[in-house]
Amino acid sequence: MLAGYYPSPGDLLTRVLATGTFDILHPGHVYFLAQAKALGDELFVIIARDSNVTHKPKPVIPEEQRLEMVDALKAVNKAILGSEKDMFEPLREIKPDIIALGYDQRFDTEILEKELTKRGLPAKVVRIPLSKECPLCSTGTIIKEVLKRYG
């Protein structure tokens, strides 16, 4: 899955991981990923599977298309789809040093760090604050605006 993306033996790179649904990709996503990349040398992104999105409406954009769009962003070294069964599964292969959470992601940083350590993945968890306000920096806001204009 990640062949060709590991550094050579002896290289010490800081690997950052970000996760998310990234439905209807917008500037807020791009700002978040740029800030996450600034925490290290490599940025890996796990895209939530359609079947795993249960805390909000199902994505409008199918997972494969969301994966393609995020993987094409300049800040992203590699994007992959998450596991449908175990959210920690891809982390075992990526082996992140830092996990970047968005300001609105529902994880508790301390609990997540404990769960990671328990699974032999001692990554530091960092919450990225809301960095830039913009009128259409949320998927929900974009959908509401589209409905207002065309609904």
UniProtKB/Swiss-Prot annotation:
SUPFAM superfamilies: Nucleotidylyl transferase. ATP binds at T21, F22, H26, P27, G28, H29, D104. It holds the Pfam family CTP_transf_like. It is an enzyme of class 2 (transferase). CDD domains: cytidylyltransferase. Pathway: Cofactor biosynthesis; FAD biosynthesis; FAD from FMN: step 1/1. It catalyses: FMN + ATP + H(+) = FAD + diphosphate. Its EC number is 2.7.7.2. Its cofactor is a divalent metal cation. GO terms for biological process: FAD biosynthetic process; FMN metabolic process. InterPro entries: Archaeal_FAD_synthase (IPR050385), Cyt_trans-like (IPR004821), FAD_synth_RibL (IPR024902), Rossmann-like_a/b/a_fold (IPR014729). Belongs to the archaeal FAD synthase family. This is FAD synthase. The gene is ribL.
